[in-house]
């Protein structure tokens, strides 16, 4: 719904980190951090989001953040702004993305870039590839009323979802082919 905030409950980057691990280019602490992130259940986060009147929610998995956001925006017929600098990411992700180490699912997830209205201006941003990174046991992406977003975030942090953050907002109703504007 227009005016709502987009909350992501877990950090991104499992795809690139495990691709790096398979190439023996990931540090042990990076993999350990990713595993800790993955074993955290989404159950309490889902309950918290529900208690804060979320109107739409999905898990972020193999299609990556952008793939799931495109599906959410199209199903809800809304446009959103996504703040790329606010994306939470796991230790080692900046390094693996800089080395252009991607999951085998990454190339097919790139087709979701058609959902970005200002795609051309962002392709060189260091976090751009993270938008397409497939997640294993990823977090939840939810749309929460603006007046409840900060309380929801505090509650998520108290429940142990330390990386939970607001990554964007719903700006208008629409049925555009490219419903997502990325802010950097």
Language-model regions, residue ranges each:
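Helix-biased detector of long, well-ordered alpha-helical tracts
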Residues: 1-184
């Amino acid at each position: 719904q227009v005016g709502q905030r987009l909350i992501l409950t877990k950090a991104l980057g499992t795809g690139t980190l495990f691709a790096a691990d398979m190439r023996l280019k990931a540090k042990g602490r990076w993999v350990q951090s990713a595993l800790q992130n993955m074993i955290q259940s989404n159950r309490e986060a889902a309950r918290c989001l529900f208690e804060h009147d979320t109107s739409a929610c999905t898990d972020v998995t193999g299609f990556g953040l952008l793939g799931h956001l495109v599906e959410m925006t199209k199903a809800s017929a809304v446009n959103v702004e996504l703040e790329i600098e606010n994306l939470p990411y796991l230790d080692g992700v900046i390094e693996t993305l800089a080395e252009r180490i991607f999951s085998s699912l990454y190339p097919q997830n790139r087709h979701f870039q058609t959902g970005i209205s200002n795609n051309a201006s962002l392709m060189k941003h260091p976090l751009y590839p993270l938008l397409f990174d497939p997640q294993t046991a990823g977090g939840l992406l939810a749309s929460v009323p603006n007046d409840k977003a900060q309380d929801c975030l505090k509650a998520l942090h108290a429940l142990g979802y330390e990386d939970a953050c607001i990554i964007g907002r719903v700006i208008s109703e629409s049925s555009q082919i490219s419903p997502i504007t990325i802010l950097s």
